[in-house]
Amino acid sequence: MTIFCELESGVDLPEYATEGASGADLRANIEEPIAVLPGQRVLVPTGIKMQIPQGYEVQVRPRSGLALKHGIMVVNSPGTIDADYRGEVCIILANFGESTFIIEPKMRVAQAVVAPVVQAKFIVVDQEEGLTTTSRGSRGFGHTGEK
C-alpha cells in the first residue's frame, strides 16, 4: 500500500523501526523542546500531511517505551486520521507521569498504524421489536468480575 505524504522542510517520512513493526514512528516537528508538566496535555505537530487510500485509516498510537517509562500517552488513543483528511497530522500527548517530560525536536513521539475501515449502515429498530437477546444482555463495565 502507498500513502502519499507532503512534508514540511526538514521533516522525515514515518519509518518502521523493524522489519516486522506494524507502527511507523512519527516525530515531533518542533524547533524548541517542549516541557510537558505532569497532568498537562500538548498538541505536537508532525509536519506531515497524508493522502490515505479510501477504505483505510491511519491510527495514531502511543509508543510503549514512552508510556511505560514516562507516562506519556496519546490522549485519544488510538487517534484516527480519516482518508478524506488533508491537514497536518498532529498528536495530542498527555503526561500521566510524576515528572516533567521534555519533548525534543525530531523525537519519536507516536506510531502510525494503517488499518482497514468498514462503514456500517445503522438502522433504527422499534422498541417493541427490539434487538436480539444474548446471555450477556445489557451487563457491562466489569460484570464478569476481576478474577
UniProtKB/Swiss-Prot annotation:
Substrate binds at R63, S64, G65, N76, T80, I81, D82. One of its GO terms (molecular function) is dUTP diphosphatase activity. The keyword Metal-binding applies. The keyword DNA damage does not apply. It is an enzyme of class 3 (hydrolase). It comes from the Bacteria. It catalyses: dUTP + H2O = dUMP + diphosphate + H(+). Pathway: Pyrimidine metabolism; dUMP biosynthesis; dUMP from dCTP (dUTP route): step 2/2. Keywords: Hydrolase, Magnesium, Metal-binding, Nucleotide metabolism. It holds the Pfam family dUTPase. GO terms for biological process: dUMP biosynthetic process; dUTP catabolic process. Its cofactor is Mg(2+). Gene3D superfamilies: 2.70.40.10. Its EC number is 3.6.1.23. Belongs to the dUTPase family. This enzyme is involved in nucleotide metabolism: it produces dUMP, the immediate precursor of thymidine nucleotides and it decreases the intracellular concentration of dUTP so that uracil cannot be incorporated into DNA. This is Deoxyuridine 5'-triphosphate nucleotidohydrolase. The gene is dut.
